[in-house]
Curated annotation (Swiss-Prot):
Pathway: Cell wall biogenesis; peptidoglycan biosynthesis. One of its GO terms (biological process) is cell division. The lineage of its organism: Bacteria, Bacillati, Bacillota, Bacilli, Lactobacillales. It holds the Pfam family Mur_ligase_C. This is UDP-N-acetylmuramoylalanine--D-glutamate ligase. It comes from the Bacteria. The keyword ATP-binding applies. Its EC number is 6.3.2.9. It is found in: Cytoplasm. It catalyses: UDP-N-acetyl-alpha-D-muramoyl-L-alanine + D-glutamate + ATP = UDP-N-acetyl-alpha-D-muramoyl-L-alanyl-D-glutamate + ADP + phosphate + H(+). Keywords: ATP-binding, Cell cycle, Cell division, Cell shape, Cell wall biogenesis/degradation, Cytoplasm, Ligase, Nucleotide-binding, Peptidoglycan synthesis.
Length: 438
């Protein structure tokens, strides 16, 4: 793809979070004339920042924070003036000379990105990991030296403003209807996701989930060489057979050696193995990672065994599909805490997944819908409360030794918490309080 020239261009950075600060510094470094705007003037602006309240025809480019909606007046004005609107990912990748590996999808992006990054590092590949995983790509480009490889997690928000991306290996973990409040339609969401492969050529690779209904369509429209993974279909590239992971019929590792738990994590592992093998990572390096990596915080995170209950924090389960995967990960009786922001999802889709749930404690905006789903599933104990604190107290009371206590909200956190991370931290604090256990 042709790279954009930023030298002497007048650029407006919209949003002053970590990514805004990083792209501001990068744009200054490469010779742009940079201005900053935000919905409210930040209190931590750098001393040399030119803050403005609006955009006009004198600007050449607007770089927005990925999460800012396109309905904002400044963005609409920029588009009406034919000023390009991009995210910091595009600015950063225009400066990068090495190979890009990128992961997107509805769920599993962060775990899959982390696994691939660790596998590359275990094989002594010079790689930096960033993107939606927490480190802005622009921040990685501030260093005077560049790595051989960038391993990136990219959200639909980032991809929508990075139309020039061309990864050597693109991974799509899965595709559900997600972030419809931002994208408005499933079609718009899928178009944003397709951006990850839109400019790939026959010399590039696209890794797809065999069970995602949109995978075949993506493969048909992409020019890249497609590879599939599946925990159930042994006719694809990366699969599981008789308790062993294979890639193109080559034995990689026995599942008994893998320490990362969860049905959904098996798909993440298969996606990571596929990308790693395409890149040329050794089986030794792959095995080293899979026999030691226990998972990320808030993603079916084992909090511990407390009063003979095994407790899991799955605060990252911000949609129905993630909670479905979490519930499928256990054979033991489950005491489930769920609830959060109501985005209009049909929570009755969880009914078939409730077969091992012995008590359901719901809170937040979705509490009544979840209780209704639980009653339809025949759960004997369904309890509605207002807050997570009350839910944890009730779960302590209802759970019994030998059972699982699972916090998997099936909803975003924003009705009561700023993000899923803070929600998960609060859950762990409440659980570790020894009071209230029956």
């Amino acid at each position: 793809m042709d790279q954009m020239n930023y030298q002497n261009k007048k650029v407006l950075v919209y949003g002053w979070a970590r990514s805004g600060k990083a792209v501001y510094q990068l744009l200054k470094k490469i010779g742009a004339n940079v201005y900053v705007t935000a919905d409210e003037e930040p209190t931590d602006l750098f001393d040399d920042v030119n803050f403005v309240d609006d955009i006009d025809e004198s600007f050449d480019l607007l770089v927005k924070n990925p999460g800012i909606r396109y309905e904002k007046e400044i963005i609409k004005k920029a588009l009406n003036l034919n000023i390009p609107v991009i995210t910091e990912v595009q600015v950063a990748l225009d400066q990068f000379k090495g190979e890009v590996l990128a992961v997107t999808g509805s769920n599993g992006k962060t775990t899959t990105t982390t696994l691939i990054g660790k596998m590359l590092k275990a094989d002594n590949v010079d790689v930096k990991v960033g993107g939606n995983i927490g480190i802005p790509v622009s921040e990685l480009m501030l260093s005077d030296s560049q790595p051989r490889v960038l391993m990136l997690e990219l959200s639909s928000f980032q991809l929508l403003g990075a139309q020039n991306i061309k990864p050597k290996i693109a991974v799509i973990t899965n595709l559900f209807s997600s972030h419809i409040d931002f994208h408005h339609t499933r079609g718009n969401y899928l178009r944003a996701k397709f951006s990850i492969t839109q400019h790939q050529t026959k010399d590039d690779y696209l890794v797809l989930n065999d069970s995602s209904i949109d995978s075949k369509d993506f493969a048909k429209r992409s020019q890249a060489d497609d590879y599939y993974f599946s925990p159930t279909n042994t006719s694809v590239n990366t699969y599981v057979n008789d308790g062993t992971i294979y890639f193109d019929d080559e034995k990689i590792i026995d599942l008994s050696k893998v320490v990362l738990v969860g049905e959904h994590n098996l798909e993440n592992i298969l996606a990571a193995v596929t990308a790693a093998k395409i890149f040329g990572v050794s089986n030794r390096a792959i095995e080293k990672v899979l026999t030691s990596f226990k998972g990320l915080e808030h993603r079916l995170e084992a909090v511990g065994v407390i009063k003979e209950r095994t407790v899991y924090n799955d605060s990252k389960a911000t949609d129905i599909e993630a909670t479905q995967k979490a519930l499928a990960s256990f054979k033991e009786p489950i005491n489930l805490i769920a609830g959060g922001l109501d985005r209009g999802d049909d929570l009755n889709r969880l009914v078939p997944n409730f077969k091992n749930v012995v008590s359901l404690i719901t809170y937040g905006q979705t509490k009544n819908k979840l209780q209704s789903a639980g009653e339809k599933a025949g759960i004997k104990q369904t309890v509605v409360v207002d807050t997570l604190k009350e839910a944890v107290a009730k779960a302590k009371e209802l759970s019994r030794p030998g059972q699982v206590l699972l916090f998997s909200p099936a909803a975003a956190s924003w009705d009561q918490f700023p993000n899923f991370e803070i929600r998960g931290e609060e859950f762990k604090k409440m659980i570790k309080n020894r009071e209230g256990w029956s």
